[in-house]
């Protein structure tokens, strides 16, 4: 936890992706594809190096665009007043049912330990987490939220807007799939779950969690502002599960991606029968859509 967060900057990860391309002996690739946290990373690859990444496919997490530079705040007192405005995160905590945003929880010192050494065991934690965010959990029926307010955010499931006094392992334990549901699952086989359990048992989750801390810290903000107003102009596409709240968790991002961030958006697909893990829950359809997109580039 107590580590330098600068390696987790978005543009440093782009540099890693660029290094990988060159390590394989190429100077460009047909496309870059990213899911979840990899979706904005793929987008930033496309923004910063369109000469290398000729197209982009984003999955689950819409890219709302490059940041805008502050303007119109010459009046110092006005800026100070804006900085004192109430926080939606604070508002969540004082709802009738007190809540907290999962990304804020992931920034806490205890988050890694809570999940890594979950009371129910690591394997059961991962299984419950995957189930809770999948289409197998029938209450995943996402829709557009009216805005970025505590009241609207609180409409999302607890894996995104957690109960204030619970950690993530406790949160998903309440939605552990039954033996029947586990037996019917075709997209998270035991051998795959075993790999996840072994590897996360070895490494823990802190590396990934540091990405959330970096984002909230403001580290790297100045360097990405170099690309303020820049759009993704190469061919792009977006895929998400029809039951994935990730599409709508940041109100307005799904629309901004299509209307402003990407000027050559070729297709948007919300795949039925899939939640957050679209590439696993509906692997055949996801592969078909990606191949169709890639075939259309030539």
Regions found by a protein language model. Name each.
Residues 1-33, 40-266:
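Flexible "cap/lid" subdomain of the alpha/beta-hydrolase fold that forms the substrate-access gate
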Residues 263-298:
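Catalytic active-site module of serine/aspartate enzymes centered on a nucleophile-bearing elbow/loop
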């Amino acid at each position: 936890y107590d580590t330098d967060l600068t390696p987790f900057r978005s543009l440093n990860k782009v540099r890693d992706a660029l290094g990988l391309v060159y390590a394989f002996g190429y100077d460009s690739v047909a496309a870059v594809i990213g899911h979840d946290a990899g979706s904005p990373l793929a987008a930033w690859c496309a923004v910063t190096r369109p000469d290398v990444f000729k197209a982009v496919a984003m999955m689950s997490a819409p890219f709302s665009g490059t940041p805008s530079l502050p303007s119109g705040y010459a009046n110092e007192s006005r800026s100070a007043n804006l900085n004192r405005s109430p926080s939606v995160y604070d508002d969540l905590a004082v709802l009738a049912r007190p809540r907290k945003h999962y990304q804020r929880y992931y920034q806490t010192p205890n988050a890694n330990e809570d999940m890594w050494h979950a009371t129910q065991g690591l394997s059961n934690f991962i299984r419950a987490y995957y189930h809770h965010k999948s289409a197998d959990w029938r209450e995943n029926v996402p829709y557009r939220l009216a805005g970025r307010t505590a009241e609207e955010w609180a409409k999302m499931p607890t894996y995104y807007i957690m109960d204030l006094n619970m950690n993530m392992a406790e949160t998903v334990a309440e939605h552990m799939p039954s033996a029947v549901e586990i037996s019917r699952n075709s997209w998270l086989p035991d051998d795959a779950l075993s790999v996840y359990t072994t590897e996360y048992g070895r490494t823990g989750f802190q590396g990934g969690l540091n990405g959330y801390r970096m984002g909230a810290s403001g580290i790297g903000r100045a360097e990405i502002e170099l690309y303020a107003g820049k759009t993704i102009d190469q061919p792009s596409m977006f895929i998400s599960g029809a039951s994935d709240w990730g599409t709508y968790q940041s109100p307005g991002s799904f629309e901004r991606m299509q209307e402003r961030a990407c000027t050559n958006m070729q297709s948007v697909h919300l795949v039925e029968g899939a939640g957050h893990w679209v590439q696993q829950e509906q692997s055949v359809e996801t592969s078909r859509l990606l191949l169709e997109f890639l075939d259309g580039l030539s």
